[in-house]
Every structure is written in structure tokens, then in C-alpha cells.
Amino acid sequence: MAEKHLKKCSTSLIIREMQIKTTLRFYLTSVRMTKIINSGDSRCWWGCGERGTLLHCWWDCNLVQPLWKSVWWFLRKLDIVLLEDPAIPLLGIYPENVSTCNKDTCSTMFIAALFIVARIWKEPRCPSTEEWLQKMWYIYTMEYYSAIKNNEFMGFLGKWMDLEDIILSELTKSQKNSHYVHSLISGL
């Protein structure tokens, strides 16, 4: 099931690369590094003191949980109801009752969150919702231009119409000005 999810996630190679790396356990955790170099310290790199397993570093750690709580908060604003299960964002294994359109929207949101977690992989700080929103906007912009180029604008609209409004409402005016953020769908 995860392989099917990998093949249809996005046309963007950067997004597909991130999804492949997380699904295939590309990132080395402190537990795996301890086994490789025979050191005794397998604690989480985020600095929480827990054992740094793959699931802990990507999902369970107290420094990563606020980001995932924000992602699920956005899902609720979109009226998408999902269990807070790490198999969904990390492996792309969705419950059977989730529509394809919702899966596409969720996958994009999850991949943006995974990007942010991976970017600060060994830094002892919490990934911020602002960074996540900026990554979402970057993905949105790239998919917009890809949809125009490939004449697939209707699929783009289905995926991004509601999500664009929520992202724009959460970004502050200074963020919008500094990152040149404006609606690509409505042209405002």
C-alpha cells in the first residue's frame, strides 16, 4: 500500500524524494547510529532524553508533537477527520473511508511537515508552524506552475482551493509581504 502511495503523491521530484526517504527509513536515528558506531548513547537528538527510535524522532517526541498538532488542527479546519496515527503521515496508509481528494490534500500537508522535521533533524528545537506554512506555500506555488504547464488545473483546484484560504488566513501581513504571498487561484 505504501508503494502505491509513493507513486502517485506528486509530480514534484522534491516532494517524491522526501516521501521516499521517510517511507524507506533513509534518515539515521540515534538508535541506528548507536548500532553502527557502537556508542552507548541512543537518546533522542531533539534533546528530550528519550530513546531515539524512528517513530520517536518523527512522531512521539515532545518537540515534534506541536507541529503534528498544528497539522491536525488544519485538517479539522478543512473538515477532514483522521485519527492521529503515525502510519498516515509517515507511510501514507490511510483508512479506507478517506476520499482520494482528501488523501491528496493530506499527503501534501504531511510531506511539508516531514520536510520541516527533516530540515532541523539534529537541532534541539521545535519545528514551527510558520516554517510549515511557508513550505506548504512553496509546494502550492510549484504545483500551480506544474498544473498550468501540464494543463491539469482542475485537479490542482480540487486539491488546493480550501487549503489556500486557510494558509492565507494564518500567515501574517508581514509574512505575506516578505515572501510575496498572494492567491494564485483567485488572482488577488
PLM region spans:
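Family-specific functional microsites
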Residues: 1-188
